[in-house]
Design a protein with these regions (language model features):
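N-terminal, post-signal-peptide metal-ligating segments of extracellular/periplasmic oxidoreductases
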Residues: 1-116
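Glycine- and small hydrophobic-enriched segments that form the cores of compact globular domains
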Residues: 92, 127-128
């Protein structure tokens, strides 16, 4: 029996994400992007910003190991609620691949005649983990 055939307990998983802008250092030689954009869990935001800036001020600037792509782990059948905070001075969003969502409210884009689901402050997205896989 494949994993996706087992009965699953559907639950709601909530994540509060925040967009931060920091210099992103790529390697030990100090190569960096001065305007790096990173999505992090809100509870990690201050620590990541503080530590990344501390390492950026070294000579040469050094990478911080927690500056990496955001990975959210959920189970098949879960409903995923994303509270997305954007304290930056531009409209941003988050878009998922591979999960089901309502394109009118949770697509994370501004396309066609659909309402704009980017934000300059706060928005909540709802996604459904109806497919097993890595996306």
């Amino acid at each position: 029996m494949q994993l996706c055939q087992y009965p699953s307990q559907s639950r709601i998983r909530r994540f509060t994400l925040e967009a931060i802008q920091i210099p992103i250092v790529y390697n030990q030689y100090g190569d960096y992007d001065p305007n790096g954009l990173l999505y992090v869990l809100e509870e990690d935001s201050q620590r990541i910003q503080r530590e990344a800036l501390k390492r950026f001020q070294q000579t040469p600037p050094q990478p911080y190991e927690e500056v990496r792509p955001l990975v959210l782990r959920v189970n098949l059948g879960d409903t995923v609620k994303i509270c997305f905070r954007n304290p930056l001075n531009r409209r941003l969003s988050i878009h998922v691949q591979g999960l089901a969502y309502d394109v009118m409210t949770s697509d994370g884009t501004s396309t066609g005649f659909n309402p704009d689901s980017t934000t300059d402050n706060f928005i909540e997205y709802t996604w459904y983990a109806n497919t097993e896989g890595v996306f």
